[in-house]
Amino acid sequence: MKQNLRNWCICLSAMLAWTLNAVAGIEVSQTLPTSGTPEHRYTMMNAQGYYCNATTSPTKDAGKYAQFAFYSSKTADTYYVYNVTAKKWLAYDQKKSYTPQTGFVKLVTNKSQAAESRITEINGGSYEIQPYTSNGVGAIYLNWYKGVGVDNPENGTVTLGLWTDNGS
């Protein structure tokens, strides 16, 4: 069976907010990882050409680009993100508010442990990803806080962090 593989990019805007560069919007997968391979897969990339690897750390090595799938939730514009490469769901510790930080994202085994994220179109088919607070509000944005370098080494293991600016 031929698999529909789409390599869209989740881009980090000039203001370091995560965005999804998708021409026709986000295509959610229906097949859960426990039942097969997600139908629609994406790669994550920032504006400087760094992609997320399996741990969501930055890489420019094409052999280390991780693939991600999106699954809808019951709330509009809200999705679960599955790291196809690592075979893990993206999660985070939900709090009343967040501050800029590195290593915010966690990778978990079960969807029941995964966190929902708000994904909003900002311009030209680009999207930004926000974790929800414990009050149900989309908060600040996923990114590599402090950029690629000491705090987020290339091909490292530090997961995505948070920053306050959106992608506009």
Label for each model-derived stretch:
Residues 1-26:
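Sec-dependent, cleavable N-terminal signal peptides
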Residues 24-168:
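Lectin-like carbohydrate-binding module/patch detector with strong preference for beta-trefoil
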